[in-house]
């Protein structure tokens, strides 16, 4: 816990306003350990905690024989503020059976998101494409997200990115998709998901210039400036930036940079010449 606390204080010292907690499915760590972690953070290092994707909630539910509603309630009571959209991949069971057979199924993933929304928690939602799905199945994924949002209005943002096949043993045979496909996917997502207020650009996977172009294809959020990231980088994809560079790219695209919180309330905005304090989130606001 203390090591995590040190990382949080480093984040706050740089102007950070939230942390993301995600991990593997470790059967040897008791559920109470996660609850104590949340309590520890809120007591000693208060910050917005965005954590525990539907896949992890499903794992907790199965491993500890708890209803998913109870898992979410316990996590929220301990200090969890919002839930990330990790593990969404493609929300079509045929694809998941091939690409991620041990993760929560498509229906279960959506069910857990709906339970979280009904519990008063906001979440993000994702789509990782290029894992063997058809174009029709990508659209089915988007439609299922749109349908759930119509019922709950609980999604704050949608983020899409392509599979990074390098160093991903089970998917290393898949071809890497190009920038054109990414920008088309962003544009189609913006049209279909007219009830999801924000689309986040994935410069982490696509690089800064393509990330900037995505602002013209439907994204209004340039994403976060991350202090530490271990998932995409493990797949041998590494792009680094600074707040000044994010600021400049947003201005050059014709937008005004702003710092935001997880719920998209604006902390501060400026003319793009500089950001007063180092920010971990940069949003392009029209």
Where are these regions (language model features)?
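Auxiliary Fe-S-binding modules of radical SAM enzymes
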Residues: 12, 143, 149-286
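Conserved Radical SAM active-site core
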Residues: 1-140, 144-148
């Amino acid at each position: 816990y203390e090591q995590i606390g040190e990382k949080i204080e480093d984040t706050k010292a740089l102007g950070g306003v939230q942390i993301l907690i995600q991990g593997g499915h470790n059967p040897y760590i008791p559920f109470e350990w996660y609850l104590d972690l949340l309590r520890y953070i809120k007591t000693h290092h208060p910050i917005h905690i965005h954590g525990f994707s539907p896949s992890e909630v499903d794992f907790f539910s199965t491993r500890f024989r708890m209803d998913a509603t109870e898992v979410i309630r316990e996590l929220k009571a301990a200090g969890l503020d919002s839930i990330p959209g990790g593990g969404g991949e493609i929300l079509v069971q045929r694809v998941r059976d091939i690409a991620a057979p041990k993760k929560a199924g498509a229906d279960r993933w959506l069910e857990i998101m709906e339970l979280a929304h009904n519990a008063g928690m906001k979440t993000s939602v994702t789509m990782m494409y290029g894992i063997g799905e058809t174009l029709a199945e990508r659209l089915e994924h988007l439609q299922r997200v749109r349908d759930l949002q119509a019922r709950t209005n609980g999604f704050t943002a949608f983020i899409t990115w392509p599979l990074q096949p390098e160093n991903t043993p089970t998917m290393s045979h898949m071809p890497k998709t190009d920038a054109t496909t990414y920008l088309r996917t962003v544009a189609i997502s913006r049209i279909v998901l007219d009830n999801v207020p924000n689309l986040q650009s994935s410069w982490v996977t696509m690089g800064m210039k393509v990330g900037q172009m995505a602002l013209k294809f439907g994204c209004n959020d340039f994403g976060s400036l991350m202090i530490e990231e271990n998932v995409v980088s493990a797949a041998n994809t590494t792009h680094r930036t600074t707040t000044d560079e994010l600021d400049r790219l947003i201005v050059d695209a014709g937008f005004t940079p702003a710092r935001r919180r997880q719920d998209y309330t604006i902390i501060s905005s400026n003319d793009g010449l500089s950001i007063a304090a180092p920010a971990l989130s940069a949003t392009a606001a029209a």
